[in-house]
Amino acid sequence: TAGRFLEKRNGDGGYMIIIQVDDFKDSKGLVEKNDIGVVWETDLPEAKAIHLHPKQMGGAILSLDWMNPKESWKWAGPEWTSHISGPITGVDGVQIQSDNPETMFQDWLEVLGNPKSSKEKLKIFLDDTWLEFILDSDGRGPGISAFSLKAKDHDIINKRALELGLISDGLICIGGITFYLV
């Protein structure tokens, strides 16, 4: 599924947005209520997850994941927190582009259970991050266009990106994705 999605976008880029949910049963119920196809599912004592069909959701494969305990992240292994280092402290938000961002915003809003949002800004607010739906700006079609990252040291990140040739029009760009630092 991911490979076909990236082919449609003509190259590298982000293909999945993972959202940790508090109540997996409720989240899965919203998916079923909205008649969205599931392309992958797992049901383990410590983790449950479903990947929603990207053709129906648009923009990315949406993964709804539940962890037990909530602070864990099975996919990263049991010791993942001891490997956190560097100037990035978290994900602030994600921009998803579309030729019809209003419709995509509404579809995602409904599947996510109508959390706090701004219809004027086409922005969905989650616990400590956001999803923003914007007009296709690069002609690659629907998909992840940018990540906004929480960072401790912008200078060191920008310096390293410049050394690696990852600056385009003054912005960090990696694999077809723009990275903003906040």
Go through each PLM region and give its residues.
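Eukaryotic phosphotyrosine signaling hubs
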Residues: 10-16, 141-145
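Short, surface-exposed ligand-recognition loops at beta-strand->loop->(often short) alpha-helix junctions
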Residues: 21-22, 94-103, 150-151
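A conserved mid-domain beta-alpha-beta active-site/ligand-binding segment of alpha/beta enzyme cores
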Residues: 90-97, 108
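Conserved donor-binding loop and adjoining core beta-sheet/short helix segment
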Residues: 1-4, 8, 181-182
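Vicinal oxygen chelate
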Residues: 28-93, 123-140, 148-149, 155-182
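Short N-terminal edge-element motif at the start of the domain
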Residues: 5-13, 27-33
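Terminal peptide-recognition signature
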Residues: 17, 108, 147
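Amphipathic alpha-helical segments
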Residues: 24-35, 100-115
